[in-house]
Design a protein with these regions (language model features):
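Catalytic metal- and UDP-sugar-binding loop of GT-A-like glycosyltransferases, i.e.
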Residues: 18-19, 84
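Short acidic-hydrophobic catalytic motif
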Residues: 31-35, 43-46
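Hydrophobic Walker B segment
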Residues: 10-13, 45
Length: 164
């Protein structure tokens, strides 16, 4: 079956072949295409994601806009692209999580059981907008609003190194 409908492809397919300009970009199960993208195109094509240019610091650490972050992927190239899905970014309550960054809520979009947050994150060398998904109940119960200061965690297992 050939389709351009992402939802249809994810729900009906056992395997997906994702093509970009007539070339196979990635092939795999719907879960692999979503959670283990191999390229920035794949990550952006299925769902929403955050993409960052990153410099290799070691085989498991990267620098994004001057901030050093742990990453569970084995980093091979000196410069790469890193993706993280909005639902994998967590608000840090204790500060004990890895990869903690401070930011300011710029916009909250109520989507029913979820709220999409647009956060201006303070990396060391610049501020960057990041998209996050949170449970509505958590945001409402903790009185998090536009212009609230938050600490977020970019969890190491969720940072995926992809080809540009």
């Amino acid at each position: 079956m050939v389709t351009r409908d992402q939802e249809e492809a994810l729900t009906m397919a056992d395997r997906i072949i994702l093509m970009n300009k007539g070339v196979i970009e990635q092939e795999g199960s719907p879960q692999d295409i979503y959670s283990k993208p191999t390229t920035a195109f794949s990550a952006n094509f299925i769902g929403t994601t955050n993409l960052f240019k990153a410099k290799k610091i070691s085989s498991n650490s990267i620098e994004i806009h001057g901030s050093i972050l742990e990453c569970n992927d084995d980093i091979k190239d000196d410069v790469s692209t890193v993706t993280i899905r909005p639902e994998d970014i967590k608000i840090s309550e204790t500060g004990s999580e890895k990869n903690i960054l401070k930011g300011t809520i710029k916009e909250l979009e109520f989507l029913g059981s979820n709220i999409r947050g647009h956060i201006e994150v303070d990396f060391k060398s610049e501020k960057t907008n990041v998209i996050c998904n949170f449970a509505s109940e958590y945001i409402l119960n903790n009185n998090i609003q536009n212009n609230s200061s938050v600490s977020i965690s970019l969890q190491p297992h969720a940072l995926k190194v992809v080809k540009a």
